[in-house]
Swiss-Prot record:
Lineage: Bacteria, Pseudomonadati, Pseudomonadota, Gammaproteobacteria, Pasteurellales
Active-site residues, as the UniProt record annotates them: 78, 168, 170
Originating organism: Haemophilus influenzae (strain ATCC 51907 / DSM 11121 / KW20 / Rd)
Pathway info: Amino-acid biosynthesis; L-tryptophan biosynthesis; L-tryptophan from chorismate: step 1/5
InterPro entries hit by this protein: Anth_synth/Amidotransfase, Class_I_gatase-like, GATASE, TrpG/PapA_dom
UniProt-recorded name of the protein: Putative anthranilate synthase component II
Keywords: Amino-acid biosynthesis, Aromatic amino acid biosynthesis, Glutamine amidotransferase, Lyase, Tryptophan biosynthesis
Domain (Glutamine amidotransferase type-1) ranges: 2-193
UniProt cross-references to Gene3D superfamilies, sorted A to Z: 3.40.50.880
Subunit structure: Tetramer of two components I and two components II.
Reaction equations catalysed: chorismate + L-glutamine = anthranilate + pyruvate + L-glutamate + H(+)
Transmembrane segments: none
EC number: 4.1.3.27
Any GO molecular function: anthranilate synthase activity
Pfam families noted in UniProt: GATase (PF00117)
Amino acid sequence: MKLLIINNHDSFTFNLVDLIRKLNVPYDVLNVEDLKENTAENYSHILISPGPDIPRAYPQLFSMLEKYYQQKSILGVCLGHQTLCEFFGGTLYNLENVRHGQKRTLKVRSNSPLFFDLPTEFNIGLYHSWGVQEEDFPDCLEITALCDEDVVMAMQHKSLPIYSVQFHPESYMSDFGEKILRNWLAIPPTTNP
């Protein structure tokens, strides 16, 4: 197992890195602007970090996903969540109220391996101004959790090891962040480089 963390220049990225360090998993951090066509080749897992702006501001993420989405285990966080949802055909919308530094309640609604051995409700930290529309959610994806305001908070692909969370598991406001990352890394990737 080897993990590539794509740094989209969010202040939370290195909080995620600190959580990964605790898991004793070999990893590399790569700035998004340095992402090249074959960069992810020798990694089994890819973590797409939070970041500013919207997914389309990062075309290199879409190029990387086009090449590797069927070959790697992928987790998106915040911007990474939005990127994965949009890649598979989801639609973003601008939230009426920006959620920066808000604690909400996550409501798990599936047996997603990401939430294995966790309660069906727990606290999460939100830092976002965009959401993914539930109404026209891509058929190949399953919504696995909402917040207490019914905003999509987590999803998984129906047949590939691809997962994402809108909330920040690395935030001090989020319960079980380390466990969520541990659960993701325990899910077998489709290939083992």
